[in-house]
């Protein structure tokens, strides 16, 4: 593999940025910010926001770098990922490992020193859950990898909440439940589009193990469940009418995409559904934030 020779090649700083999966981390940090503001009756101090985002962001980048490291052989097979820094050989295994360890320790240190120990602990558990349990084991072990491993990816709003309150709260767990329910239809839509690549890499994603039509049915059912779960903040008086209207519009639109995906054989619809799911989560959390203050 090219990775063997990466120590001899000049490394661009952009390769290290790519290791952190910045677009994924930015979406995650949006949910952290919303969690912080929903936990506070007023405004949150900029100092706390800065240290929380920096600490959690560094830890998320560390987990992403470990994902690149562990999945380098798989990534080299798949067209979508074969040019990732470690898989392509621009960053060596040793370089990626040291980078992940250093920024992970930096992130945890910032959280311990400037936020609180509970947030640092939960962030560490999340890092281990994603980088160790999901990437290292679940991804290759079961077709329910995304469902079980999705809990780690759903934690960011809880981390934002505890950064402000230094305690666990049922309302914060509601935000976790929303992302946890959103994760399967989000990733399974991509898995349908990339079906052949996952099959060639021998990754037991649901479309590979149970077929594409069965996966489409599961996407549809999870999208219905997501619509119901997304209304819970209004039901428990955590949010008001602005959020309810936004959640209904977004949820119904997501259902339309799931319906369209179920009844079509066009692969492009799976990618369109995947892309809408990202927009859905962004806007849903924006509605939560807007509703909180207006």
UniProtKB/Swiss-Prot annotation:
It holds the Pfam family UbiA. One of its GO terms (molecular function) is protoheme IX farnesyltransferase activity. Pathway: Porphyrin-containing compound metabolism; heme O biosynthesis; heme O from protoheme: step 1/1. The chain crosses the membrane at residues 24-44, 48-68, 96-116, 118-138, 145-165, 172-192, 211-231, 241-263, 268-288. Signal peptide: none annotated. One of its GO terms (biological process) is heme O biosynthetic process. Its EC number is 2.5.1.141. PROSITE patterns: UBIA. The keyword Transferase applies. Converts heme B (protoheme IX) to heme O by substitution of the vinyl group on carbon 2 of heme B porphyrin ring with a hydroxyethyl farnesyl side group. PANTHER family: 4-HYDROXYBENZOATE SOLANESYLTRANSFERASE, PROTOHEME IX FARNESYLTRANSFERASE, MITOCHONDRIAL. This is Protoheme IX farnesyltransferase. It comes from Legionella pneumophila (strain Lens).
């Amino acid at each position: 593999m090219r990775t063997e020779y990466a120590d001899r090649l000049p490394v661009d700083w952009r390769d290290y940025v790519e290791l952190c999966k910045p677009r994924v981390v930015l979406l995650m940090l949006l949910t952290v910010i919303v969690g912080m503001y929903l936990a506070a009756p007023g405004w949150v101090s900029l100092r706390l926001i800065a240290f929380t985002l920096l600490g959690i962001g560094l830890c998320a980048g560390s987990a992403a770098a470990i994902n690149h490291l562990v999945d380098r052989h798989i990534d080299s097979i798949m067209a979508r990922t074969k040019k990732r820094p470690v898989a392509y050989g621009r960053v060596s295994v040793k370089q990626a490992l040291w980078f992940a360890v250093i920024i992970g320790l930096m992130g945890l240190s910032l959280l311990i020193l400037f936020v609180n120990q509970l947030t640092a602990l939960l962030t560490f558990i999340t890092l281990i859950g994603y980088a160790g349990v999901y990437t290292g084991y679940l991804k290759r072990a079961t077709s329910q990898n995304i469902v079980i491993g999705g809990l780690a990816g759903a934690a960011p709003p809880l981390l934002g909440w505890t950064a402000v309150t230094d305690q666990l709260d049922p309302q914060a767990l509601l935000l976790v439940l929303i992302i946890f329910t959103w994760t399967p239809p989000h990733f399974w839509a991509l898995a349908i589009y990339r079906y052949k690549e996952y099959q060639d890499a021998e990754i037991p994603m649901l479309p590979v193990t149970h077929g594409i039509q069965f996966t489409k049915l599961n996407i549809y059912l999870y999208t219905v469940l997501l619509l119901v779960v997304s209304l819970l903040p209004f039901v428990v008086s955590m949010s008001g009418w602005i959020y309810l209207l936004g959640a209904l519009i977004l949820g119904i639109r997501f259902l339309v995409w799931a319906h369209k995906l179920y009844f079509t054989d066009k692969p492009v619809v799976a990618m369109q559904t995947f892309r809408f799911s990202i927009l859905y989560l962004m806007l849903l959390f924006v509605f939560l934030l807007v509703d909180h203050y207006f």
